[in-house]
Amino acid sequence: MDCGNPLFLQWIQEWMEESTRRFPKSYQTWRKAYDSMKSCPITFHRPSQALALKGIGPTICAKLEKKWNAYCLENNIPISTHNEQNDSHVNANKSSSETSSEKPRSVKKPTTRKRKVYVPSYRSGAYSILCALYMLNKHEFATKPQIVTMAQPYCDSSFGSATDRNMRYTAWSAMKTLITKNLVYQTGHPSKYCLTDDGEEVCIRLAKVDDSFQRKHTVSNFSVSKSDDHDSSLCQPPNFVTSINKAGSSSDHGGELHVTYCPVDHNEVSDGVETDIDVDQVDSLTGIHDHHIINNEQLIDLTEQEKKQPNESNLSNLKIETVLFSNCTVFLLIDTREIRSPLDRNLIIDKLTNDFGVNCQVRSLELGDALWVARDMESGQEVVLDFVVERKRYDDLVASIKDGRFHEQKARLKKSGIRSVTYILEESSYDESFTESIRTAVSNTQVDQLFHVRHTRSLEHSVSLLAEMTKQINLFYEKRKTLAVIPDLSIEAKTYESLREQLLKIDPSTPYHISYHAFSSVLSKSSTLTVGDIFIRMLMTIKGISASKAIEIQKKYPTFMHLFEAYEKSSSSQERNLLLNKTCQGYGFQTIGPALSAKVASVFFPES
């Protein structure tokens, strides 16, 4: 069967072949249009008539029409008279056919279907998260541990771990669904969450028929200190948001109406499944109530709220929480990578627990091989204490020095803000040609980073040392009696280091702590790296640039662009080669010598 429109077919074939190179996902669409046009024996007067073919829609027709007009213009062909000799293929009535062919067929606009508002299943993860966030003041932020504490009573699934071995997700997995559907706003690092305007609207409508959705608490009710004066305004949504005037709000329920929306079989529904209840239907159920909707709204410029963020120049809004150490139990956390076999578990965990009476747990730690936390027995929140241990065998130390992990690890330990960092070095067989390298690494660690280094004969000796350290840590904090804790809502990964420096300037004698959740988030290797972090890693790939030297360079030139611009402004190659030697004059091992400075310049600004 011959194609009635070979020219149109040729154009569609060209676009189909082009899609294989540029837009692979659209190839099948063009393939269907090509096959449909090829199998059609009828000759069309205008490309718009091809809408009658299956697989050719308004977009392809518009593209054909544009190409057709350009073709006619280029070849001096009257658009209205072209292909009139083929009218017999179109219709017996020539006059009506010509009239209809001159006008492009009007395309009926697709009807837009009303989007069904998402309503989570009763007592699911999404339901309980919305319920918890609605308890807070409007646009008040909360962290994951605070939300979990508030949400768990309203959820049948566990937020902590999967209750069924076959389940891969916990109730917290529903948070991703809520963020995707624009019901919850996520910001910061560590992440903070609050309801969006859409989420607020859904909760307000659910509150009319469900007593669980009530304004009950503020974030401070769930903080470690139980302080009532916590300033929740430290975090606010960006730009402009709608704020409700509390004085003008009112809610009056004439009677109680309980609605349970769950499947007929009473089995739990996954969070991703929407119920059959539309929010509009929920509204219709509340006609028996005299419910007054809050309508007194005002816009707040939240650029002013950003000034309340604790930074180098403003700490007035920071409310340090105080935790009584007598209400806490100290736990020693061991990294999972240290427990590689049942033998390791017997030597480390069982020996610490049974022989020394140490409370210990195995977790995947973001930093260090051993870490101490104080768990508040009332709230359950864990506070990271000012002690961390990194354990290395001599052979592992040699390997980490070779590949640069040792320097990067020390930089992360320094960045953590923990005051007491201890390296435990265990004796083991190693290449003795690296003896001098080990001595240099140990002395640098003690003098430059001011870390403690302890040598042990074996794993058993290291375990005994951990038990003794646990005992001394308990005695240290028993004398202090209280723990000063920075609230999670006041912590941001970008400003955490400078925040600690400012607090130490104000009160050097007080160690400031953060929660285990915030600690893991701020120091996570998988978290988003800043441009400055990437620049430090770039510098450390150059032989001779240690972590301390890379940090010293990054202090003067925060990003690679700053250093590159400084090289561009140099008047000569000699000035460029000595740039870092003159501008980065640290002390000891942080000094950049002339040879190393020239080496960095040759890498980042090679001579043409």
From Swiss-Prot:
The gene is mus81. PANTHER family: CLASS II CROSSOVER JUNCTION ENDONUCLEASE MUS81, CROSSOVER JUNCTION ENDONUCLEASE MUS81. S.pombe appears to be critically dependent on the mus81-eme1 endonuclease for the resolution of meiotic crossovers. This may be due to the absence of an alternate pathway for crossover resolution such as the MSH4-MSH5 pathway which exists in S.cerevisiae and other eukaryotes. GO terms for cellular component: Holliday junction resolvase complex; mitochondrion; nucleus. InterPro entries: DNA_pol_lamdba_lyase_dom_sf (IPR027421), EME1/EME2_C (IPR042530), ERCC4_domain (IPR006166), Mus81 (IPR033309), Restrct_endonuc-II-like (IPR011335), WH-like_DNA-bd_sf (IPR036388), WH_MUS81 (IPR047417), XPF_nuclease_Mus81 (IPR047416). Its cofactor is Mg(2+). Signal peptide: none annotated. This is Crossover junction endonuclease mus81. SUPFAM superfamilies: DNA polymerase beta, N-terminal domain-like, Restriction endonuclease-like. The lineage of its organism: Eukaryota, Fungi, Dikarya, Ascomycota, Taphrinomycotina. Changing residue 275 to A: In allele mus81.T239A; abrogates phosphorylation in response to hydroxyurea and abolishes interaction with cds1. Belongs to the XPF family.
